[in-house]
A protein has these predicted regions:
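Extracytoplasmic/periplasmic solute-binding protein
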Residues: 2, 30-86, 132
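A local structural motif
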Residues: 15-23, 86-90, 105-118, 131, ...
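Extracytoplasmic/periplasmic substrate-recognition and gating elements
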Residues: 149-189
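Short helix-initiation/N-cap motifs at beta->coil->alpha
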Residues: 26-31, 114-129
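Beta->alpha turn/N-cap motifs
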Residues: 120, 137-142, 179-181
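Short glycine- and hydrophobic/aromatic-rich loop-to-beta-strand nucleating segment
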Residues: 1-4, 9, 183-185
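Paired acidic/hydrophobic, glycine-rich loop segments that form the ligand-binding mouth/hinge
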Residues: 133-137, 159
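Glycine-centered hinge/linker elements that transmit conformational signals in sensory
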Residues: 33-38, 76-117
Length: 189
């Protein structure tokens, strides 16, 4: 899911013109995007470098995007087809994947051109040091966050939000659980 820092969010809720007054109001991609873009425009007031931690695209560090985030469009495609397995994935929900990925990149702690040099440790450090309000990761992330030297995030302020992508009916979506369990094979390789 999306881990968020409740303390930073509470600070945002108190700002004049905040798009929401509580996390309970964020139940769709449309609302998440509205809030993230508003927070990014007010990052100086919030004392953050960006809403989302840097997207770790260093080779070997990109598993959050190639697997964990990819679970969502695959899940919805399987759900539509009422199957548990497919020989071929059409990536019908690629635009939804792009929605959230672009939101992460465009409202980040760093410029998009630097993301190829960022690691998971970098993104979790940014979160731990209070430089961002949100980071995509799992419930195992707390041990990494807590282990960062200079960590400013209290354990009670670490909360989770579903990863919204703009799929119809997502307001009823919960948190993703488990990890990926699929293989993609290029028949041309």
């Amino acid at each position: 899911g999306i881990i968020y820092n409740q303390s930073i969010m509470d600070k945002y809720f108190k700002l004049d013109g905040a798009k929401v007054k509580s996390m309970d109001e964020i139940n769709s991609f449309t609302k998440l995007k509205e809030v993230a873009e508003d927070m990014q425009s007010k990052k100086d007031e919030l004392g953050i470098k960006g809403v989302f931690a840097s997207t770790s695209l260093t080779p070997g560090e990109d598993w959050r995007w190639q697997t964990h985030l990819a679970n969502l469009p695959i899940y919805y495609e399987y759900k539509d087809n009422n199957v548990k397995d497919e020989d071929k994935i059409s990536f019908k929900y690629s635009d939804n994947y792009k929605n959230i990925f672009d939101l992460y990149i465009n409202n980040s702690t760093c410029e998009p051109k630097l993301l190829g040099s960022k690691t998971v440790a970098d993104s979790l450090s940014e979160f731990a040091l209070g430089q961002c309000a949100m980071v995509q990761n799992g419930n195992w992330g707390w041990s990494q966050i807590a282990g960062v030297s200079g960590n400013t995030v209290k354990e009670d302020d670490v909360k989770f939000l579903p990863i919204y992508t703009g799929v119809k009916g997502e307001e009823k979506q919960g948190l993703c659980i488990g990890t990926e369990n699929y293989f993609c094979i290029n028949k041309e390789a």
